[in-house]
Amino acid sequence: MSDKKICAITGSNGYVGGCVKNYFAVRGWEILELARQPKPNSRAIKFQLGEEVLPSAFENVNALVHCAYDFKPLRWDEIRAVNVDGAKKLFQAARTAKIPKIIFISSISAFDGCRSLYGKAKLEIEKIALESGALVIRPGLVYGDGSGGMFGKLVAQVRKSSVIPMIGDGSQIQFLVHNEDLSVFIERYASGEIQISPQILTAANEQPWPFKQLLLEIARSFGKKPKFIPLPWRLIWAGLKSAEMCGLKLNFHSDSLVSLMNQNPKPDFSENSQAGLVCRPFEIERLKV
């Protein structure tokens, strides 16, 4: 049997999960991927959110990082059945298997009074995670060299065009976290280097970035001065919602727009320093975009 520590990760095919997986591998962990379509030549088990998980799948696993979230369900009953109940089954299996460290990757979009179904689902999962003895982390907008995810899409949009649609007035506040800072903290907790009790932590630098200012900063790195075309967000939401009701498959959902337009104005960063969670300020000059 290998002496390597084993980390089970869900959502490793996504941007955040992939960053976490890669960092754990660099730190010498053996990775057990839980995925709908396991990649060839990887240690993996077939995993579908919402389905039962056998505790035996976690034999000798030292840590579980739950990053997966299924965006396909659009109605609350479907979201709850897949993502919330699915997380409950996963955490129950992890507890039965006596996994020492469990980490749930929530979202800064999850907060009391949030309006998006995504945020509400994450809140429900947070409660289950805490009851299961998990550490809950709410990352802000995750970025890094060669970024994927939402930040990568923003970079691609600014790079390809000098005319950028602006949903609303661009005043929506974003809090950012470098993928390395996020991954380092998760690994330090999983390895036992950081000893803290199960709690909720917001993983982001405390500097607020208005959405428009963030796009201007990205554009500046390309030497561009973009022109913004304002679009009323409720009109865009209505169009997205209508398309969804017609059964069209979209890359950006109406609920994601609700989340973007209704962020937490005052995330709680009060416990970060004591917990050892350090998030660098966003500096576009230091990125390879």
Regions found by a protein language model. Give the residues of each.
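N-terminal Rossmann NAD(P)H-binding glycine-rich loop of SDR-like oxidoreductase domains
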Residues: 5-27
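NAD(P)H-binding glycine-rich loop region in Rossmannoid oxidoreductase-like domains
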Residues: 39, 47-89, 93, 108-112
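Conserved beta-loop-beta element that borders a ligand/cofactor-binding pocket
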Residues: 127-145
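Conserved Rossmann-fold NAD(P)-dependent oxidoreductase catalytic core, especially the SDR/UDP-sugar
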Residues: 85-123, 131, 135
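SDR active-site strand-loop-helix element
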Residues: 10, 34, 67-68, 102-108, ...
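A conserved pocket-lining segment of Rossmann-fold NAD(P)-dependent short-chain dehydrogenase/reductase
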Residues: 156-177, 185-189, 197, 202
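Mid/C-terminal beta-alpha module of Rossmann-like enzyme folds, strongest
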Residues: 189-250, 276-289
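Glycine-rich "substrate-gating" loop/helix at the edge of Rossmann-like oxidoreductase active sites
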Residues: 140-147, 168-180, 204-207
